[in-house]
UniProtKB/Swiss-Prot annotation:
The keyword DNA damage does not apply. It is an enzyme of class 4 (lyase). It comes from Salmonella dublin (strain CT_02021853). This is D-serine dehydratase. Monomer. Its EC number is 4.3.1.18. It catalyses: D-serine = pyruvate + NH4(+). CDD domains: D-Ser-dehyd. PANTHER family: D-SERINE DEHYDRATASE (PTHR48078:SF9), THREONINE DEHYDRATASE, MITOCHONDRIAL-RELATED (PTHR48078). The gene is dsdA. GO terms for molecular function: D-serine ammonia-lyase activity; hydro-lyase activity; pyridoxal phosphate binding. Keywords: Lyase, Pyridoxal phosphate. One of its GO terms (biological process) is D-serine catabolic process.
């Protein structure tokens, strides 16, 4: 307790985190892209290489997962306006939201129905490509749909993949690995939903369940993989490959906006609100967005009041040297995808200069907004995916933040507020009804 008091003396906002209050923190250390980019340790070239790799795999994905065929084997989601939800939020919170609210529907991505279809699938494909190239079975000029042949399945079956997950990452990696032919084990934390485990098992994935939280599942997965030289561990806490899989979203969103005739520049700022668990997904996406839109995009991470690991780590500068449990927070939240007690040190350090801020919200707030979105727009998401929905009213109410960035009322009126919906497209009907029943 004494240590917590010392921490609060240095970092007063910790008191609100400990009290589980909904908290907003605007990052005083935010810099321009030019200043912040060198600290990421990855470049635009790295993201372009990821983009090219996904293009090589497109013919394979189009055949392996027919639901991606219409998009030519690209796993990408729609961006839709949500005007009725915007009005509902203004009414419920008594706060005008200047500009236009949009929803990025990663919740409905093909194959695994969450943002994790970006990073998780990309890392599995990267590993498969590496093995096949090294074995001389493939060249980068080949049509990758050849990977569907029995010979390749046979080849990949001597290798295995392991990952620790609260659910969605395990789902995307499990489904993709099984399709390629890898043996795959997913180490699931206590928060993982039963339907996600059942779905994995139906794909022939081995699911190992833990009574503990995410950190333990990852640690056990890492240990199990170490004893097998043919086992590749996908490390959600430190993986640069996962991060790059998410980062590809930036250029793709830029292309979608261009198609829609939507302008992003100094006079038309873009605010993006990303739910954050360990940090890989939102970190990678935010990195890609910064590369695509530069200083005209402003990224915010959103976390549950019971799992504010990234806010705690970045705000104190302690990153992965502190966990929410260290300050007496239980890490128990209905937002199972965000139930992480210790943030990725890699992501926190890489992105701390490129984030405009982080905020927390209560589970009940997520349930309420889940219900409103279903009523107003007919879109159904899982609780975690609503974390970003609280962002626009916080930003529009933050006069000091607006002044610091010199936003005029005209600029704010021309703003786009993009809420990144991270999951929910595959939630079973009965489970969704339970979520909807909890909203007020």
């Amino acid at each position: 307790m004494e240590n917590i008091q010392k921490l609060i003396a240095r970092y007063p906002l910790v008191e609100d985190l400990v009290a589980l209050k909904e908290t907003t923190w605007f990052n005083p250390g935010a810099t321009s892209l030019a200043q912040g980019l060198p600290y990421v340790g990855l470049t635009e070239q790295d993201v372009n290489a990821a983009h090219d790799r996904l293009a090589r795999f497109a013919p394979y994905l189009a055949k392996a997962f027919p639901q991606t065929a219409a998009a030519g084997g690209m796993i990408e989601s729609d961006v839709v306006a949500i005007p009725a939800m915007q009005k509902r939020l203004e009414k419920e919170y008594g706060q005008t939201i200047n500009g236009e609210m949009l929803l990025k529907k990663d919740s409905h991505l093909a194959i695994s129905g969450s943002i994790k279809a970006r990073g998780g699938i990309y890392e599995v494909l990267t590993h498969a490509e590496k093995l096949a190239l090294e074995a001389g079975l493939l060249t980068t000029d080949d049509d990758y749909s050849v990977l569907l042949s029995p010979e390749f399945k046979q080849f990949f079956s001597q290798y295995s993949i392991a990952v620790g997950s609260t659910g969605n990452l395990g789902l995307s990696i499990g489904i993709m690995s099984a399709c390629i032919g890898f043996k795959v084990t997913v180490h699931m934390s206590a928060d993982a939903r039963a339907w996600k485990k059942a779905k994995l098992r139906s794909h022939g994935v081995t699911v190992v369940e833990y009574e503990d939280d995410y950190g333990v599942a990852v640690e056990q997965g890492r240990k199990a993989a170490q004893s097998d030289p043919n086992c590749f561990f996908i490390d959600d806490e430190n993986s640069r490959t996962l991060f790059l899989g998410y980062a590809v979203a930036g250029q793709r969103l830029k292309a979608q906006f261009a198609q829609q005739g939507r302008v992003v520049d100094a006079s038309h700022p873009l605010f993006v609100y990303l739910p954050c668990g360990v940090g890989g997904g939102p970190g990678g996406v935010a990195f890609g967005l910064k590369l695509a839109f530069g200083d005209n995009v402003h990224c915010f991470f959103a976390e549950p009041t019971h799992s504010p690991c990234m806010l705690l780590g970045v705000y104190t500068g302690l990153h992965d040297a502190i966990s929410v449990q260290d300050i007496g927070i239980d890490n128990l939240t209905a937002a199972d995808g965000l139930a992480v007690g210790r943030a990725s040190g890699f992501v926190g350090r890489a992105m701390e200069r490129l984030l405009d801020g982080l905020y927390t919200l209560d589970d009940q707030t997520m349930y309420d907004m889940l219900g409103w979105l279903a009523q107003e727009e007919g879109i159904r998401l899982e609780p975690s995916a609503l974390a970003g929905m609280a962002g626009p009213q916080r930003i529009c109410a933050a006069a000091a933040y607006q002044q610091r960035h010199g936003f005029s009322q005209t600029q704010l009126g021309n703003a786009t507020h993009l809420v990144w919906a991270t999951g929910g497209g595959m939630v079973p009907e009965d489970e969704m009804e339970q979520y909807l029943a909890k909203g007020r």
